Amino acid sequence: MLQPKRTKFRKVHKGRNRGLAQGTDVSFGTFGLKAVGRGRLTARQIEAARRAMTRAVKRQGKIWIRVFPDKPITEKPLEVRMGKGKGNVEYWVALIQPGKVLYEMDGVPEELAREAFQLAAAKLPIKTTFVTKTVM
């Protein structure tokens, strides 16, 4: 699963997920899966969607993952009282703003790409849409 090799700090503040996204254009492939809603994707969800897409296209074409889980989320163990410091890092998330391209695909027909992205979108907790590369 995806996670940073090393970080400057082990734990981070919760923060907010506001604003609009960077990386809103399909830049590597021909087709893309773009976030319509706002939220956070865990490394497991990103991997599950990638596997669903890869199986749908039967390992042909090329897939790019445009998001990376770089924020650690901490949790305290079960039945532990409040206080006594921040919990341990349990998983990593990527913060997603509307307009962010999550995945890209190339080398497959459009119908197959749509089908694959639909299977991937079912694994994700945010609303998404299918986009194609705009030629200027």
Swiss-Prot record:
InterPro entries: Ribosomal_uL16, Ribosomal_uL16_bact-type, Ribosomal_uL16_CS, Ribosomal_uL16_dom, Ribosomal_uL16_sf. GO terms for molecular function: rRNA binding; structural constituent of ribosome; tRNA binding. Signal peptide: none annotated. Keywords: Ribonucleoprotein, Ribosomal protein, RNA-binding, rRNA-binding, tRNA-binding. Disulfide bonds: none annotated. Part of the 50S ribosomal subunit. Belongs to the universal ribosomal protein uL16 family. This is Large ribosomal subunit protein uL16.
